[in-house]
Amino acid sequence: MLVTLSLLSLFLCALATFLFYIGIKGKQPASVQKKAICCLAVSFILLSFLLCVSAIRDMDIYVLRSWYLIPLAWSLLLIAFIIYYKLRYTTIFVFVAPLCFILLLSALIFLHQEKPMDNLVVGPVLVVHLSLVFAGIGIMGVAAGAGCLFLWQENLLKNKTKLMNLPKNIPSLGALDKVNHIAARFGFPLYAIGLIFGFIWAYMAWGCLFSFDPKEIISLLILALYGFLFYEREVRGTNGRKTAKLALIVFAVAMFSIFVV
């Protein structure tokens, strides 16, 4: 059942990605984008059911690194829909849909190549840790998407001869910068608290808070970069290209920690 639900979600994300591309290139972007958003909504529901079933039937799966990619994709969709509900920015899904497809595809490829860890390390503290960390990374994933659109649109505006390539329904630079600001304000505290629960879980599982494991070191690096973005936005009031690039860097390091470290 879990594999079937994952495959259905994967297909819907792929279909949504295709529809968004058609919507951008076509003459009726609004109607096509609505269909794409419906596909992502169904995918989100399927992933929600998948996570609930897996939590009830087999908690061991939550300690597999490849499995992390599925709740991360779920978090990305959740954050994207929250932003869509509050700000009505449909363009943010253009980045989220293909990214979720890549995450789900990677999870399905690598899921059966890992063995679960001891049952003793699985528990509520781990669930809280993963939930908050994924929420923080998911928020930054959406901010990274907004950052890509910000830098791309700014480049087109600087080269006025390319303005014809600018889609009519893309959010303004100010709107994209606002997404970045919201991400820094709420994402950093969530990630920081999630990391604290991670160290508590490590102490409960292995008897030490910090073991200089590469995963722990890069998590602190992500926290430092995330904190720097938070400082730049909330304390110094920085905006524009710098914070857009920072969001991309934070998310890139987070993806490196998941796929490589």
What do these predicted ranges mean?
Residues D118-F134:
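Active-site glycine-rich loop that binds ribose-phosphate moieties when present
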